Amino acid sequence: MSEQEEKCLQRPGFDGIKSEHLKIIAEDITEPLTYLIKKCFESGIYPSILKKAKVFEKVLSTRMIRYLKKFKILSENQYGFTEGKATSDAITKNVNQIHQNIDNRIPSICIFVDLKKAFDTVNHKLLLEALERIGFRGNAYSLIESYLSNRPQSVQISGSFSKEMYIKCGVPQGTVLGPLLFNIYLNDIFQINCVGKITSFADDTAILYEGTDWSDLKNVIENDFIKIIRWFNSRKLSINYSKTHFLPFGSYARHLPNYTNFSFNINDQKMQINRVPNIKYLGVVLDHHLRWDIHVNYILKKVRFVSYKIKYLGNILTEKYLRTLYHALIEPHLTYGILAWGAACSSHTYNLDVFQKSILKIIFKKPKLYPTEKLYADVRMYDIRQLYFLHSITHYHKFRSYLYLAPKFYDIIPKDLKDLRFGNCFKRNLKKWLHSISRTEIHKPINTNIN
């Protein structure tokens, strides 16, 4: 159990009772609690006192998720708060399509929508209507209506609670059900008959457009995006136009359009979306040409900040603990979104490669001029290219879906690996095989295709 999880168990709830105390009496309260929850489902009433608790919410959430999965109600293009999906999946999906468009010289533009306080402005009446449309009726409808009504909310600061206020809109913050209800509220956007391909992660929405030429694409977007604006307006969700931007993609600057904004007339008001040279999307910095130099510099800033801790502890902790720190503090930054940016050309990842080697030499007490090939072989760690290869093969073997360069990588691995079912056995044997061959054999197919 992590230190943060231990603190959560020690911290009491609104009633002053700690989780660790509840665990002691769990057997004694299970039966009456089960009876109470059963009666709530039968009556369609969510008791006010339980609105401050999470147990009933978790049961209700589990049943709702089971129903949504059974009838495949939520769109496949929703990635937020969904089991088995992550921000990196949304990034990979869009970047793969953009890569294909750039390779085929297809003009493409992505609009990144920013919403003003999306979670706080969800309209309860419209949310209940959305729930009814997807089959929540009778007691199920009444139960969620009861859950949302007369709901108090307060803030805890330094152990003290603020005065309770009753919320009239928005999904309850810090709750189990809140994110799920927001997904349901947003789900209808995928039913809009629009040209753009919509991807969402919570309140981060991206719409990807592609066309035959830049001029026609501008006309398509200015006509099509109005539908999306109207949908947000109909759901009482406000677009923050000052933070909503678009990014065109192409191989070179000469392949990009010359316009810098899109204009929309909504209810006699002129709205404008401006073009930007790069944008941070779900923690990954995209640029016009998907060269990733800006994103790599962004990663470098983060890992350099963390590396000072490792350098400081280098003479205090053992190699075992320093390795653990590396995997906990450095490697997550190197692997986040790597399926999108891992194919950046070596000149753009050079500084990151140098950083990784230097930090590994500190951890494993190697001299500055220690040979790179021998370093990675000795410490049995992966460089950036190997991490990209590893994650690409793992993703491709699991989903068998298109992934930039992954099919070419897949041809390299042995047949007995390909024949394994996806799981721990496959991943373990893939890592073992990856350690058995030289780094240059992995670098070659990547560098051949991108440099």
Role assignments for model-derived ranges:
Residues 60-78, 103, 179-208:
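Active-site palm subdomain of RNA-directed nucleic acid polymerases
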Residues 1-36, 42-46, 99-107, 229-247, ...:
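Short, charged alpha-helical motifs in flexible N/C-terminal segments and linkers
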Residues 1-54, 161, 175, 272-280, ...:
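Surface-exposed loop/turn segments and immediately adjacent short secondary-structure elements
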Residues 161, 223, 238-277:
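Short, conserved micro-motifs composed of acidic
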Residues 270-340:
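Basic, alpha-helical interaction scaffolds
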Residues 118-134, 194, 206-230:
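Catalytic palm subdomain of template-directed nucleic-acid polymerases
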Residues 2-172:
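Conserved pre-catalytic core of RNA-dependent polymerases
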Residues 52-55, 78, 108-118, 170-178, ...:
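Catalytic palm active-site di-aspartate
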